[in-house]
Curated annotation (Swiss-Prot):
Pfam families per the UniProt record, alphabetical: Defensin_beta_2
Similarity remark: Belongs to the beta-defensin family.
Keywords: Antibiotic, Antimicrobial, Defensin, Disulfide bond, Secreted, Signal
Protein purpose: Has antibacterial activity.
Organism: Pan troglodytes (Chimpanzee)
Protein name per Swiss-Prot or TrEMBL: Beta-defensin 124
Gene that this polypeptide is encoded by: DEFB124
Residues spanning the signal sequence: 1-22
Main location: secreted
Domain of life: Eukaryota
Keyword Disulfide bond: yes
Length: 71
């Protein structure tokens, strides 16, 4: 009986653990993640609505817009 009770308690606790993907809010058309700090493989793009950083992988970062030179 105690094993059954322990099993039920374990199921209840594990049922409340959030999945890893829902830990961060998504940004930049779903490609980035809102975090306090960006990892070394990511760059900061803009601020998320909650004032955290929108971190985007370097592989997904759009190329810079070329500046026009006036002669």
């Amino acid at each position: 009986m105690t094993q059954l009770l322990l099993f039920l308690v374990a199921l209840l606790v594990l049922g409340h653990v959030p999945s890893g993907r829902s830990e961060f809010k998504r940004c930049w058309k779903g490609q980035g993640a809102c975090r306090t700090y960006c990892t070394r493989q990511e760059t900061y793009m803009h601020l998320c609505p909650d004032a955290s950083l929108c971190c985007l992988s370097y592989a997904l970062k759009p190329p810079p817009v070329p500046k026009h030179e006036y002669e």
